[in-house]
């Protein structure tokens, strides 16, 4: 299983250790998204930055859409299925399946590891970006509902 992690809050007033963890996750700016494997190390990092990001389990269909719509190659070149097939030797669906199952990491592919997203259409949840998802906000763990948020942000 793989997590999609999206940075929600900015950099003003962030403690140094949390800023370092966000940097290690490659979440330098708001509305940036990374795909990480579900390991104990990453779970600990997510718990540390839970007040600045939201995360959940991404499904295959959403990852395919994310790669095709927001994936970039070095030099900020757009991605299409033919380029993916040429560079990796597999189609986009197969690549997404292997990333989700943890067989390969996104950084082992020619794609850039960070996806730059739009702010969500119709905004975040009613509670805003200062409250956890569990009480109606946008922060923290949200499980399968991360796919709905990613659809709104693509």
From Swiss-Prot:
PROSITE patterns: RIBOSOMAL_L30. One of its GO terms (biological process) is translation. Pfam families: Ribosomal_L30. One of its GO terms (molecular function) is RNA binding. The keyword NADP does not apply. The keyword Repeat does not apply. SUPFAM superfamilies: Ribosomal protein L30p/L7e. Keywords: Ribonucleoprotein, Ribosomal protein. It comes from the Archaea. Belongs to the universal ribosomal protein uL30 family. Part of the 50S ribosomal subunit. NCBIfam families: PRK06049.1, uL30_arch. This is Large ribosomal subunit protein uL30.
